């Protein structure tokens, strides 16, 4: 498509000013001549105000404001200045008039209705209306209520929320601009197309019409015409604008205007009768019926022909049982038949409904009957008190008189019949020695069971306590609505008409000591009105009515023929320039520089940087706790850095000696040993006063009682050994910390999209590429940051603190809240306390812990040669100077402040339909943990392969789509292991650690005897259709209505082809 140079408002203003100056010069020259004004010419009958006699199919004859009488197509742009000058040169000059000269009069302007009006001003045009008049594009007016060529003079609409339902109609011509020119910011200027051909609207409407707005709310199509709808604000007032868009040429040039057609806007239209035939009441009723059918179909619980679920897997009998139960090993229960809650079962000679006999958890499917060959005893599974038991039954002989007894499964009692037709088994005194729990008599369930009670022995497998949950069951969305018990806790005491509720129970209303439960909106509204403190039911009724009110409002507004003129007779599609997106693709991109993905073009993260405003916070030197010392196999005469120069490094000793709050201690080991040096004991008086008289020193002198002198091996026991230690807080010459404050930080993500670079931020998370638009879900900016630039012995590193410091709170002593010096010479913080020196033996348990704040531990170390020993020094934390030390900075800062916790989300809107690449390799290390056929999701985790998103399937069932890398999800398992997983190609086996549904607990009571026969439920499709004939009839009617609605939508889309792809 050929490109056109955008016409800016500045260029248009310069051209209009030049044309205005020429016009003023021409008018001034004409006014200076002495001539008599011509009488006004009469309008021809074809251009009179009565437009009823003209041909509506052909072009209109219009006269310009110059009165030259030539034909001109006012839908085109004005002629160039060369043609205009040539036409002036061919026109003969007017002859001089003999009338006396008169004063110059204001020029008069043709109004298009046979008259003229004085021009308001002679200066340059100041608004688009004056600019259109100056260009000579003022066609004759016409009555907007009569028929008019819709393409020669088109109509746009404006309406404001501040003025109510008042619609302003703006009639104007199109200039020959083709597609509207775009400015540098991607917007188009509607003032370039403002060429009115109807009544001039008020000034505030013209100002709103020419207000620039780049966002387009939607495109409205009507036949071959296209309208663009916009929302914008002018001076605090919100306006809606419906602009007529020009047609676009397929070859890049402006296409010719379509043939002029005439359309009479009436209440009924003969051209489109389908728009009127289907009104708001019919749409509301049809939508109500369809929604009721959808809700009823989803919740009514239509039963299939047969339950095809797999039979339940029973647990194996426990091994820890008594020897007298060994004969039951060969009597394992057979697999029962599958059925559903619509079947019947035989109890004695009577057939009863299964829902009246079996407990609730069996009604959900998976229940059965286990008939064994032995009539009197057998094994089966009992469910009682949320526990599963593997039970062995023994008949009891009938008692002489009816005696009530209490069961282990329930607290209810039942009377045993007085007589029994068959003798009972003599196993009354059998015990459950090998079983753990679950023993007790079983109450009789049915009157047809004439046998006596049974002793139930079982092994407890699991114990769960699910809470009570309810659901609502609706028949076709109409009342009455029933309450369905999903799970029930017996302790809650919910009853239906006095009968305890079990899972699967359906009841209009449940009662318990906690209150009442119902699904009926009328009852809910009544309960909410009666109990003003609880508005849950009223809110539920309100939420139920809101969708229908919205449907009514939408249908009423969409089906009205008049009201919002052209806006309400079309359908909203999408923004201006109909969308060319084929489809949307979504994937993730990791946040490490160099990560790449395919969506569907290659996207790579080139780097991450952040921008901020930097304020220098100065520099400081941290306190440094430094210690030194020496282990000497004799007593020195001069305890100082000079006297101990042979054992102590000179430079550290001098730096520590000149430091702040110095601590210096001298210990003498074995001062009271016997022998030739025993007289030295008197020198070590507490405080060292005697020693200082003979050996002057500045350190504290302490005797080291109980310490070993093994460090100086090879000497007699009367050897005296000394230990010297020196420590203080110093300013290290090569340790500095500079502080910088970063405000208004903004993270910039540098992406490479198909080779093209693109930067996204939280303010602009989009990338426009030739392939489509990329939207990035970027994390929020970190906010204010504090940067610590630490320089330790030439190794410079930066640490970042999140947020601004609270200098009036807990951060008052931190480095960022102190006064710093530019040359890093100031020590930050108060002077720390004097360090504490302590002599610790090598086998002291104290060495297993860390030194306390401001403590220094010294330990003599045995040397490898005689008279050679060393000293091990351990310094603790910095005490009161902790907050100024590098350790505090590392504990309160991070090395990467803009690293997000998760990946970046990429949403790509493609230009043409493409499909994202899908991984075909199987996932790796997939683990499945949980249970199957138990209604609880199991945990599925593993590693997705590269090459695109993995559409994970587990045993043929879709689990979800995951990007390459580790994934964790939950899925319902319907089959037992083994599990095969794949990503659409080859499959692999996953490791599974699951438990079967028999190990899961349910709510209920003992479901009866093993001798109860359950008839298998089978139902043909004909029987099902005969039982549901009314629902099928209603569904067929709804299907016909839905087909009619779809046909109307298809016809509407057919008529909107001009808006979807304007020609």
UniProtKB/Swiss-Prot annotation:
Highest taxon listed in the record's lineage: Viruses
Cytoplasmic topological intervals: 556-582
UniProt key word Lipoprotein: yes
Region ranges (Human C1QBP/SF2P32-binding): 30-69
Entry comment on modification after translation: Structural polyprotein: Specific enzymatic cleavages in vivo yield mature proteins. Two signal peptidase-mediated cleavages within the polyprotein produce the structural proteins capsid, E2, and E1. The E2 signal peptide remains attached to the C-terminus of the capsid protein after cleavage by the signal peptidase. Another signal peptide at E2 C-terminus directs E1 to the ER, with a similar mechanism. Capsid is phosphorylated on Ser-46 by host. This phosphorylation negatively regulates capsid protein RNA-binding activity. Dephosphorylated by human PP1A.
Residues linked to a glycan: 353, 371, 410, 429, 658, 759, 791, 1011-1012
Lipoprotein as UniProt keyword: yes
Membrane spanning residue stretches: 535-555, 1029-1049
Segments on the Extracellular side according to the record's topology features: 301-534, 583-1028, 1050-1063
Key words of the record: Calcium, Capsid protein, Clathrin-mediated endocytosis of virus by host, Disulfide bond, Fusion of virus membrane with host endosomal membrane, Fusion of virus membrane with host membrane, Glycoprotein, Host cytoplasm, Host Golgi apparatus, Host membrane, Host mitochondrion, Host-virus interaction, Lipoprotein, Membrane, Metal-binding, Palmitate, Phosphoprotein, RNA-binding, T=4 icosahedral capsid protein, Transmembrane, Transmembrane helix, Viral attachment to host cell, Viral envelope protein, Viral penetration into host cytoplasm, Virion, Virus endocytosis by host, Virus entry into host cell
GO annotation (BP), single: fusion of virus membrane with host endosome membrane
GO-annotated cellular components: host cell Golgi membrane; host cell mitochondrion; membrane; T=4 icosahedral viral capsid; viral envelope; viral nucleocapsid; virion membrane
Modified residues (Phosphoserine): 46
Positions with biased composition (Basic and acidic residues): 70-87
Region (Disordered) location: 1-131
Location of the region described as Functions as E1 signal peptide in the Swiss-Prot/TrEMBL record: 563-582
Cysteine pairings via disulfide bonds: 153-197, 590-595, 619-824, 641-653, 699-712, 758-767, 807-817, 931-934, 950-983
Pfam families recorded: Rubella_Capsid, Rubella_E1, Rubella_E2
Residues where Ca(2+) binds: 670-671, 718-719
Region listing for Functions as E2 signal peptide, in residue ranges: 279-300
Record's miscellaneous remark: Structural polyprotein: Translated from a subgenomic RNA synthesized during togaviruses replication.
Domain notes: Structural polyprotein: Contains two internal signal peptides that are necessary for directing translocation of the glycoproteins into the lumen of the endoplasmic reticulum.
Listed name of the protein: Structural polyprotein
